[in-house]
Amino acid sequence: SFTNNKKGFNADWHYANSNTLLGMLNLYKASNDYTYQAFVDKFNQHVFDHYHFFKEQYCSLRIMRGAYFRLFRATMLDDTGGAALPLAETALNAKPQILHREILDQVLNHILNKQSRLADGTLCRPEPVEQTIWADDMFMSVPFLLNMAQLNKDSKLYDEAAFQVLHINHYLTDPRTNLCRHGWYNQTKELAPVAWSRANGWIVWAMSETLLKLPTNHKKYKKIKDTFT
């Protein structure tokens, strides 16, 4: 389990762990075996119980690669919308926790106000190549935005999620194959040479989440559905 992993990676604030935990939540929904939900709850509680210790390490002691450093580094979507999905997915049914909302609000603020964007508003990467769009960032932003739209009852977050789906897909789609490339470089206006299968999986996942959670009467729903199919 994540509690006895020697390196502690399985307990870390990381998008790979986030995806695994989402899988467990889906297993719980499919099997009604509460063991899966309990594991996710345990992970989330681990974040809350040790949050101030992790924050002290990073913000005061300047331990830049300490436990959960990405939660406080928050320089890209890997650190924010990608890693926070288990908290966002469970927030509607979770017991009220001040830290739960505090972390979600921090992440949402980063996506809306701090994350790098192109001039048209499309989310992009600050590095390793400035203003590069990656397929990763559709799943690291859109599912979180959809959950927060429901939690906050904020239709503008649905609009933002739909905008990112359509714009990221537009930039990354190779018209010759209709596959998404892994990246698009704003500096050269060129697609990356690779249509990475995992990246296409992220796109499919993010778009399917959108079709499941975006209100069907949303003005962009049909366009997203047509793009998906």
Spans of model-derived segments:
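Glycan-recognition and catalytic cores of secretory/periplasmic carbohydrate-active enzymes
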Residues: 1-229
